[in-house]
Amino acid sequence: MSMNELAVNIPLEHMSNVFGQFDVYIRKIEKTLGVTVIVRDDQLKIIGNEANIKAASEVFTQLYELSRRGNVITEQNVNYALSLLAEKKETSLVEIDK
C-alpha cells in the first residue's frame, strides 16, 4: 500500500484549541483514521493512504474553522466530525455551528 503525504496549515494561535490538551485530538484522529500526523511550526503533515489523509485533512480544517469562529473545541466536536465522515454526510461540523 502506497503512503501519501498532505500538508495542512493551522495558524499557531489555534493549534492548542484544535489539537486538544497534550494533542489528545490529534491522537484520536490518527487512531480513528489510520494516519500519522507530524506537527512542524504552523503546518501539519498527514501521512497515510490517500482516502484517509483526505478525511483527516477535512476534520482538521473543520476544527480549525470552528476555532477561528471563537469556539472552544471539545472531544464531542472531534467525535462528531469523525462520525459525519464515517456516515459520509454532506453536512460539515462548521455548517451545524452557524
Predicted features by range, described:
Residues 3, 18-22, 39:
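A positional/architectural concept
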Residues 9, 20, 50:
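Conserved residues at beta->alpha junctions
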Residues 38-97:
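Interdomain "pre-motor" coupling segment immediately N-terminal to P-loop NTPase/helicase cores
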Residues 13-33:
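Short amphipathic alpha-helix segments
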